[in-house]
């Protein structure tokens, strides 16, 4: 989550350890946009990454097209707003985005809140969460749309969809994928990453 992810080489160093936020388990990246300023969209790079270690736990990033998992989701917001994400974008707490420890960045996943069956496609553009038993960290806006912002955490299902485009904002398209318990419609191609069309 908006962390300086030189984790593979720095996670075991004393210098890195001194900077780790005990609440989140990682060091925060620099804030490049202040609250109230316009947050630029896109601008990152496609990244899978090498294995890395945080707080004694090894994470192995991979491009797993069949990824589907259930676990706890949390959300992050003001503390990380305007900071660089792990793939070089800028975190916007009001965008439809998420942090995941191993999935490619940027990519799309559908997140379903198992308590109310709301689901939403979000953009994974950061690494995390690294605290407790959390599986994915959603932006403030994503947690609000999925109905668990006030609770702080929710049990969710995460399903990988595919790569996300590097440039521009996809927020409007992603908000349109919100489902309130009804099945998602047949996929429609709305973006492209390289030569591969992405269906949302």
Residue ranges, per PLM feature:
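Secreted/periplasmic proteins
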Residues: 10-200
């Amino acid at each position: 989550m908006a962390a300086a992810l030189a984790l593979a080489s720095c996670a075991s160093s004393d210098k890195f350890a001194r900077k780790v936020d005990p609440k989140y388990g990682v060091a925060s990246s620099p804030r490049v946009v202040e609250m109230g300023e316009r947050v630029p969209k896109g601008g990152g790079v496609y990244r899978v990454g090498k294995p890395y270690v945080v707080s004694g736990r090894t994470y192995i990033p991979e491009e797993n097209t069949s990824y589907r998992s259930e676990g706890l989701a949390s959300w992050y917001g003001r503390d990380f707003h305007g900071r660089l994400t792990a793939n070089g974008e800028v975190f916007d707490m009001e965008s439809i985005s998420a942090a995941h420890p191993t999935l490619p960045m940027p990519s799309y996943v559908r997140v379903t809140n198992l308590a109310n069956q709301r689901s939403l496609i979000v953009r994974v553009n950061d690494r995390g969460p690294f605290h407790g038993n959390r599986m994915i960290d959603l932006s403030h806006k994503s947690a609000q749309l999925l109905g668990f912002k006030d609770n702080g955490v929710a049990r969710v299902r995460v399903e990988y969809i595919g790569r996300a485009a590097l440039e521009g904002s996809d927020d409007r398209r992603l908000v349109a994928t919100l489902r309130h318990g009804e099945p998602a419609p047949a996929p429609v191609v709305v973006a492209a990453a390289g030569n591969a069309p992405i269906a949302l």
